[in-house]
């Protein structure tokens, strides 16, 4: 099983790339985290936010592994504890499907994409920079894995 984080946005600051890379490299080979950056659609006077999100949806879908479980990050998504994420990670590893976490662009994710996602989750009730969400999600995936392994990284 591979974990894919598909994120709309590119040209992140070095500290974002470094933070993401730190947690991604800690993951074991059978549960690697891969980042797929999706170039955002340029907003202009002729393109509404809805049009841009629909165009980004097509780019996201093209970048995802076939048959992957789709977990969309959204402000209205379900709150998960680290332990709950660890339980989901265990289930996902058992069924063997790849899992794709989707981070939308400046306007979020297309409504149709969210409707078709297997699950909506949120990282925080607060608004966060999209680059930081990459780092936080990678850290939480590593934490979830460490919980499943009784690794001392996660302390209760």
UniProtKB/Swiss-Prot annotation:
It is found in: Cytoplasm. The lineage of its organism: Bacteria, Pseudomonadati, Pseudomonadota, Betaproteobacteria, Burkholderiales. It is an enzyme of class 2 (transferase). Homodimer. The keyword Metal-binding does not apply. Its main location: cytoplasm. Keywords: Cytoplasm, Methyltransferase, rRNA processing, S-adenosyl-L-methionine, Transferase. Its EC number is 2.1.1.177. Gene3D superfamilies: 3.40.1280.10. The keyword S-adenosyl-L-methionine applies. It comes from the Bacteria. This is Ribosomal RNA large subunit methyltransferase H. Specifically methylates the pseudouridine at position 1915 (m3Psi1915) in 23S rRNA. It holds the Pfam family SPOUT_MTase. It catalyses: pseudouridine(1915) in 23S rRNA + S-adenosyl-L-methionine = N(3)-methylpseudouridine(1915) in 23S rRNA + S-adenosyl-L-homocysteine + H(+). NCBIfam families: PRK00103.1-4, tRNA_RlmH_YbeA.
């Amino acid at each position: 099983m591979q974990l894919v984080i598909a994120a709309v946005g590119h040209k992140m600051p070095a500290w974002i790339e470094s933070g993401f890379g730190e947690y991604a490299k800690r993951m074991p080979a059978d549960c690697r985290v891969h980042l797929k950056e999706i170039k955002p659609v340029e907003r202009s006077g002729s393109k509404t936010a809805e049009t841009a999100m629909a165009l980004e949806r097509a780019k996201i879908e093209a970048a995802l592994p076939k048959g992957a479980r789709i977990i969309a990050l959204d402000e209205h998504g379900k709150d998960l504890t680290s332990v709950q994420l660890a339980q989901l990670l265990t289930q996902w590893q058992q069924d063997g499907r790849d899992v794709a976490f989707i981070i939308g662009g400046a306007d979020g994710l297309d409504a149709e994409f969210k409707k078709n996602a297997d699950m909506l989750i949120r990282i925080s009730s607060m608004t966060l920079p999209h680059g930081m969400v990459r780092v936080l999600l990678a850290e939480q995936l590593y934490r979830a894995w460490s919980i499943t392994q009784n690794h001392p990284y996660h302390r209760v």
